Amino acid sequence: MSLKVTGLNKAYKDNQVIKDYDFEINPGEVVILLGRSGTGKTTFMRIINNLEEADRGTIEINGKVLSKDNGTKAVYSSNSERRAYQNELGMVFQDYQLFPNLTVIQNLIEAPLAQGLKNKEELIEDGKKLLADVGLSDKTDVFPSTLSGGQKQRVAIARALMLNPSVLCFDEPTSALDRESADQIGGLITALAKDQGKAILIVTHDTVFGKQIGTRIESSTAFAK
């Protein structure tokens, strides 16, 4: 088991966005959360990535617990435990969230360098290998503004992989891409699940993309059943 969510609830005033939701994803799966905008998909993604609190529920990744049943405030006893949970998750945002003033390789090493996981030289080598894996070995020292949407998405994926997460989350990965670029990203995601055993969770309203690469499709209407 990579990620398990039990009894998750989230409301905004009188709007119950997520109600008693259970979810599980295992290594090698590509799970698609499919649904229209406003059905709670992004809220769910933000909660499991510890970017937003739920009202109630339990979230566990490989034995590392984010929350207890009375709410999703972190229950870590130390900063190292908090990092251990967060490092199990890699997040690729809809708008990529690359730092425009940093080169591609600098974007990749920023977070692990701040955590002191390895020295700078080792991280640069790791980053170069990942960029080669996503087909961007020639873009190491350029700035994000020079890249296409598909290339930015690949950089964002490589950056998320720098911490070697067991679960990789994507928020609308094809929203800014043409179909050819979307298919290329889909192939890369499939390889991450099949070859590396990553558990992949994708939030999207792109039905074609979801059905192409998903090993399981869940509707976001289940959030507020």
Listing of model-derived features with the role each one plays in the protein:
Residues 57-71:
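Conserved ABC transporter NBD signature motif
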Residues 102-110:
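Short coil-to-helix segment of the ABC ATPase nucleotide-binding domain corresponding to the Q-loop/switch region
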Residues 143-147, 151:
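Conserved ABC ATPase signature
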Residues 168-171:
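Catalytic Walker B motif of ABC-type/P-loop ATPase nucleotide-binding domains
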Residues 179-181:
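Helix N-cap at the start of a conserved alpha-helix in ABC-type nucleotide-binding domains
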